């Protein structure tokens, strides 16, 4: 037997020695790639079913042909196996499982736990002490909710650093969206009462909130506090108006509606969410499938993965029956504080919700496939233009952004054959170079990106084509960076706007000096423009954020004569750097520890003026 003889796996023999207990099984290829993760109520029976007879479809045939080993984990019950399966699928992303691809964390409403709580939109890890309400299907729903809360209940939204340093109410107070707890315009008792009402509102207890408002209004009237009674009356009117606008069905309470559409090997799962009877909108998911799963299987995989991460509502409506629905209900109910019900074949208004979700899923999938087809045509045009042998699987593009050398940021965006892969975008804060040296910035960014790929041996993350936003000089720097880390298999292409800098007149520059002029109507150039423009957008937004952060933290410290104490006095007096910048020299000089001369220096520095200009401004102010 030679060293390179194929490895065979005797699945029947492996299955015969397995336990009949519930658990999770994993299948691996020769290179240790994880092919598939599955759960079973009885491991021996489930695993044996793969190797008894002919596989039922080509996907299964292809997968089993690659299996060289398996391992299993026994669990106490099938529900525990389901949870472990979901965890492994999410963390290990097996090749042949249906994968929920969602590179965004869901937005929540955060109500902080402190003396004067603030309310805000929150994404990411829940490490800030407080209550988190959600998740919501999209950021628009959260912003609409927060706008309503600020209008009705006037809770603060400012960060603690701003809250602690204010000496007068901010603009939010002036426009009636905050009660100015920062300067004690509202009493602590009244603010706490507002927080309580917001909590009821976010918990979906609008009817209970309305009852409390009516009682409070009656008490205020009995005590002849007519202004307070009028405010409560207006709040109650606004609340009822909001209920009339937003409640689709008072009986709907908290529920999610899910529908799945599939076409040409692609799938879309649409989520329609209601909380407290309010329609919070829809969200579309396009899970990675292998093209042969039934929609019920796709929907089942989605339900198990999605609600393993996000808390399910008491009622989930489906457009069809799914496998393991009883097991899923039991698992979700066990991990939640309430019973979870999965329902299909519903009637009345709920049937209307399901029908709406089905139509939206079909439209979303059709739109996505049209977009993907157009993207594939453009990708193929790029392949032909550049003379590549195989299809393009991955392209990357780098761009540099700075303001006269300040806060330099490099971006790297990633596209595959069907569009952007935003979860793999990267930004690089550039340091240790001469300000404004774009060549050095490009070289540093590319070295950092590919050195990590080389060190971690991530061949799959290397692009077929690497576009550089720039001409021959930038292209040469990119080549030097790749040589420095030992990467040779990446095709480098410079994208130059040319002398006229007009869209559609870009020139593609190759390493050998060859220039390509695709023309404005070229599908290849349209693809390249999309990639280049996305890299530019991603670089600029990163640069602006870094520049703003730098300026907010260091602008005052850079002024001679301003130490930590004077800086604190200025920020406290004016409520932040923006307030200092908006003030005149005379007003700045009124701050403790700030002389007239120092005020002039501060004003000049913040406005980029010379001493003479500052003196003239002083006479005007």
From Swiss-Prot:
InterPro entries with a match to the protein in the record: GIY-YIG_endonuc, GIY-YIG_endonuc_sf, GIY-YIG_UvrC_Cho, Hlx-hairpin-Hlx_DNA-bd_motif, RuvA_2-like, UVR_dom, UVR_dom_sf, UvrABC_protein_C
Matches recorded under CDD domains: GIY-YIG_UvrC_Cho
GO biological process per UniProt: nucleotide-excision repair; SOS response
Classification via Pfam families: GIY-YIG (PF01541), HHH_5 (PF14520), UVR (PF02151), UvrC_RNaseH (PF22920), UvrC_RNaseH_dom (PF08459)
Source species of the chain: Xylella fastidiosa (strain M23)
Annotated keywords: Cytoplasm, DNA damage, DNA excision, DNA repair, Excision nuclease, SOS response
Localization of this protein: Cytoplasm
Subunit: Interacts with UvrB in an incision complex.
GO CC term (a single one): cytoplasm
Entry function: The UvrABC repair system catalyzes the recognition and processing of DNA lesions. UvrC both incises the 5' and 3' sides of the lesion. The N-terminal half is responsible for the 3' incision and the C-terminal half is responsible for the 5' incision.
Designated gene of the protein: uvrC
Entry's family note: Belongs to the UvrC family.
Protein name stated in the entry: UvrABC system protein C
Domain called GIY-YIG: residue spans: 20-98
Gene3D superfamilies membership: 5' to 3' exonuclease, C-terminal subdomain, GIY-YIG endonuclease, UVR domain, UvrC, RNAse H endonuclease domain
Gene Ontology molecular function: DNA binding; excinuclease ABC activity
Record's keyword annotation contains 4Fe-4S: no
UVR domain residues: 207-242
């Amino acid at each position: 037997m030679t060293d390179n003889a194929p490895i065979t796996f005797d699945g029947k023999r492996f299955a015969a020695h397995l336990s009949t207990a519930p658990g999770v099984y994993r299948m691996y290829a020769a290179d240790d790639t994880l092919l598939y993760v599955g759960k079973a109520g009885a491991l021996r029976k489930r695993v044996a079913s793969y190797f008894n007879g002919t596989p039922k479809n080509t996907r299964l045939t292809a997968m089993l042909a690659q299996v060289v080993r398996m391992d299993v984990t026994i669990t106490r019950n099938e529900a525990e196996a389901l949870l472990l399966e979901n965890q492994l699928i999410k963390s290990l992303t097996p090749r042949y499982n249906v994968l929920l691809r969602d590179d965004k964390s869901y937005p929540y409403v955060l109500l902080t736990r402190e003396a004067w709580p603030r309310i805000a939109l929150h994404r990411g890890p829940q490490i800030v002490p407080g209550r988190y309400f959600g998740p919501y299907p999209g950021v628009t729903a959260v912003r609409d909710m927060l706008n309503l809360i600020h209008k009705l209940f006037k809770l603060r939204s400012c960060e603690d650093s701003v809250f602690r340093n204010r000496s007068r109410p901010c603009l939010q107070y002036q426009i009636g969206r905050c009660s100015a707890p920062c300067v004690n315009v509202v009493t602590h008792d009244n603010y706490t009462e507002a927080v309580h009402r917001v909590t009821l509102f976010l918990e979906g207890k609008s009817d209970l909130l309305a009852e409390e408002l009516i009682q409070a209004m009656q008490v205020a009237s009995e005590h002849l506090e007519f202004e307070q009674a009028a405010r409560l009356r207006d709040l109650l009117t606004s609340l009822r108006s909001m209920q009339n606008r937003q409640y689709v069905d008072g009986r709907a309470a908290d529920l999610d509606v899910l529908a799945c559409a599939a076409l040409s090997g692609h799938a879309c799962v649409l989520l329609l969410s209601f909380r407290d009877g309010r329609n919070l909108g829809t969200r579309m998911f396009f899970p990675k499938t292998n093209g042969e799963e039934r929609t019920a299987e796709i929907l089942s995989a989605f339900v198990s993965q999605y609600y393993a991460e996000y808390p399910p509502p008491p009622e989930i409506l489906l457009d069809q029956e799914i496998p393991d629905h009883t097991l899923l209900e039991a698992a979700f109910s066990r991990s939640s504080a309430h019973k979870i019900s999965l329902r299909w074949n519903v009637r009345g208004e709920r049937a209307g919700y399901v029908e709406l979700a089905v139509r939206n899923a079909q439209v979303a999938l059709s739109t996505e496939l049209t977009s993907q087809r157009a993207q594939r045509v453009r990708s193929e045009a790029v392949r032909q233009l550049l003379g590549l042998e195989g299809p393009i699987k991955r392209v990357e593009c780098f761009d540099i952004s700075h303001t006269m050398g300040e806060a330099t940021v490099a971006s790297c965006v990633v596209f595959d054959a069907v569009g952007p892969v935003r979860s793999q975008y990267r930004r690089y804060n550039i340091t240790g170079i001469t300000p404004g040296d774009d060549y050095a910035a490009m070289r540093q960014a590319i070295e950092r990106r590919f050195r990590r790929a080389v060190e971690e041996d991530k061949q799959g993350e290397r692009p077929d084509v690497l576009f550089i936003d720039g001409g021959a000089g930038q292209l040469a720097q990119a080549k030097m960076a790749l040589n420095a880390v030992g990467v040779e298999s990446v095709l480098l292409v410079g994208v130059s706007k040319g002398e006229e800098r007009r869209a559609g007149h870009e020139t593609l520059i190759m390493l050998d000096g060859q220039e390509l002029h695709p023309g404005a109507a070229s599908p290849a150039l349209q693809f390249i423009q999309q990639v280049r423009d996305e890299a530019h957008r991603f670089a600029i937004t990163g640069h602006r954020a870094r520049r703003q952060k730098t300026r907010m933290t260091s602008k005052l410290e850079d002024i001679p004569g301003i130490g930590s104490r004077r800086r604190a006095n200025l920020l406290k007096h004016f409520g932040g750097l923006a307030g200092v910048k908006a003030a005149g020299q005379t007003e700045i000089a009124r701050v403790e520890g700030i002389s007239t001369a120092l005020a002039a220096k501060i004003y000049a520095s913040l406005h980029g003026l010379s001493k003479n200009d500052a003196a003239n401004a002083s006479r005007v102010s």
